[in-house]
From Swiss-Prot:
Subunit: Homotrimer.
Record family assignment: Belongs to the transferase hexapeptide repeat family. LpxD subfamily.
Protein name: UDP-3-O-acylglucosamine N-acyltransferase
Single GO biological process annotation from the record: lipid A biosynthetic process
Purpose: Catalyzes the N-acylation of UDP-3-O-acylglucosamine using 3-hydroxyacyl-ACP as the acyl donor. Is involved in the biosynthesis of lipid A, a phosphorylated glycolipid that anchors the lipopolysaccharide to the outer membrane of the cell.
Top-level EC class: transferase
Keyword check for Thylakoid: no
HAMAP family referenced in this protein's UniProt entry, alphabetically: LpxD
InterPro entries linked: Hexapep, Hexapep_transf_CS, LpxD, Trimer_LpxA-like_sf, UDP_GlcNAc_AcTrfase_non-rep
Organism: Burkholderia ambifaria (strain ATCC BAA-244 / DSM 16087 / CCUG 44356 / LMG 19182 / AMMD)
Keywords associated with the record: Acyltransferase, Lipid A biosynthesis, Lipid biosynthesis, Lipid metabolism, Repeat, Transferase
Membrane-spanning parts: none
GO molecular function: N-acyltransferase activity
Entries under Pfam families matching the protein: Hexapep, Hexapep_2, LpxD
Length: 364
C-alpha cells in the first residue's frame, strides 16, 4: 500500500519540503532505497548519501537539511522531497510499524480447539488463543491479547489488554503483565528466584547438611508497554514482587533475579545478568553481557557499558565501564605480564625511593 507524504505528515507530524503527493510504499536505507521508498538520515556523517540516494523521499532533521542545502549551494541534491522532523529515527520507527500493521492481516479472535482453558479462567472474547496454549484457573486474559502456540499462563495471572506473547513463552502463577506487553518466544516470567538457605555442620570432608530451598512466594509485576526478548528470564520475588516498570525494553537472554526493580524507560541489552534485590533507576542503559551484583542500586540515567561488572551502588548519573576492550593478542600478553609483575615493580620502586632518601636525593 502506497501513502503520500501528505498522508504521513497528517498521521505523524513533520513538515514537507517538496512534493506532498509523492507516494512511498516502504522504507529502505539511503544507499539502497528506490523511488517508491522512504529513507531516513539519523547520523549526519551519512549526509553525502542523501545527495546520491534514489529514494523518493527522505526523513531529515532541520539542521541536516540546512547543511545539505549549504553544501549544494541551495540547489536540489538527491531526492527533491523531504519530511523534516526533529527525530528522523523515531519517525522512521513509527512509519515502519504502520507499514507492518497495514501488511499484516489481523487474526480472528477465538480459541484454537487444541488450547486448554480452565473453566475458572477469564478470556476476553476479542483475545486470540493459539494452538496448544494453556491458561490455568483464575487467570485473566484481557481484550485483544494474542497468545501464540504453546504459551503457558499460570493460575491467577493477568495478561493486560493488547499484549502479544510469542510461541512457547511462559508466565507462571500470580504474575501481572501490563497492557501492550510484547513477550518473545521462550521467555519465562515468574520462575523461582535463586534462594537457598545453607544448613551445614562441620568442615572439610566432615561437613554434613544441605541447602534448604526458600519458597518464592512473591510474583512479577510488569508495567505497560514493556518488551521482553526471546529466552529472557525474570524471577518471581521471594516475598514481594519483582517489578518491571513501564516502557522497559529487555533484549534476548537476559537474567533478572528475584526482587529486582527496573525503572521506567530503562533498556537492557542481550545476555546481561542482574542479581537479586537490585534496583535500577529510570532511563538507564545496561550494555550487553554486563553483570550487576545483588542488593545494589543504580540511580536514574546510569549507563553501564557492555561486559562491565557492577559490584557496588552507583547513585550518580553517568557512564560506567570496567570491560577490557579487545587488543592485539601480543599486546594483551605483554599487558598481562606487566600486571602479574606489578607487585615486584612496586617493591623495586619502594627500594629505590628508600635508597634515594638515604642519599638525600629526594624527600622521604
Amino acid at each position: 500500500m502506497a501513502l503520500t507524504l501528505e498522508e504521513l505528515v497528517k498521521r505523524f507530524g513533520g513538515e514537507i519540503a517538496g512534493d506532498a503527493q509523492c507516494k512511498v510504499s516502504g522504507l529502505a536505507p539511503l544507499d539502497q532505497a528506490g523511488p517508491q521508498q522512504l529513507a531516513f538520515l539519523a547520523n549526519p556523517k551519512y549526509l553525502s548519501q542523501v545527495e546520491t540516494t534514489r529514494a523518493g523521499a527522505v526523513l531529515i532533521a532541520p539542521k541536516d537539511l540546512e547543511k545539505l542545502r549549504a553544501a549544494t549551494g541551495g540547489q536540489a541534491a538527491g531526492p527533491l522531497n523531504f519530511i523534516v522532523t526533529p527525530n528522523p529515527y523515531a519517525y522512521f520507527a513509527r512509519v515502519a510499524q504502520m507499514f507492518i500493521d497495514l501488511a499484516t492481516p489481523p487474526r480472528a479472535p477465538g480459541v484454537h480447539p487444541s488450547a486448554t482453558i480452565d473453566p475458572a479462567a477469564q478470556v476476553a472474547a476479542s483475545a486470540v488463543i493459539g494452538p496448544h496454549v494453556t491458561v490455568e484457573a483464575g487467570a485473566v486474559i484481557e481484550d485483544g491479547v494474542q497468545l501464540d502456540a504453546n504459551v503457558f499462563i499460570g493460575r491467577g495471572t493477568t495478561i493486560g489488554a493488547g499484549s502479544h506473547l510469542y510461541p512457547n513463552a511462559s508466565v507462571y502463577h500470580g504474575c501481572k503483565i501490563g497492557p501492550r506487553a510484547i513477550i518473545h518466544a521462550g521467555a519465562v516470567i515468574g520462575s523461582d528466584g535463586f534462594g537457598f538457605a545453607p544448613d551445614f555442620v562441620g568442615d572439610g570432608d566432615a561437613r554434613t547438611g544441605s541447602w534448604v530451598k526458600i519458597p518464592q512466594v512473591g510474583g512479577v509485576t510488569i508495567g505497560p508497554d514493556v518488551e521482553i526478548g526471546a529466552n529472557t528470564t525474570i524471577d518471581r520475588g521471594a516475598m514481594a514482587d519483582t517489578v518491571i516498570d513501564e516502557c522497559v525494553k529487555i533484549d534476548n537472554q537476559v537474567q533478572i533475579g528475584h526482587n529486582c526493580r527496573i525503572g521506567a524507560y530503562t533498556v537492557i541489552a542481550g545476555s546481561a545478568g542482574i542479581a537479586g534485590s537490585t534496583t535500577i533507576g529510570r532511563h538507564c542503559m545496561i550494555g550487553g553481557a554486563a553483570g550487576i551484583a545483588g542488593h545494589v542500586t543504580l540511580g536514574d540515567y546510569v549507563i553501564i557499558t557492555a561486559k562491565s561488572g557492577v559490584s557496588k551502588s552507583l547513585p550518580k548519573a553517568g557512564i560506567y565501564t570496567s570491560a577490557f576492550p579487545a587488543v592485539d593478542h601480543g599486546e594483551w600478553n605483554r599487558s598481562a605480564a606487566l600486571v602479574r609483575n606489578l607487585d615486584k615493580l612496586r617493591e623495586r620502586i619502594k627500594a629505590l625511593e628508600t635508597a634515594l632518601a638515604a642519599q638525600g636525593g629526594t624527600d622521604a
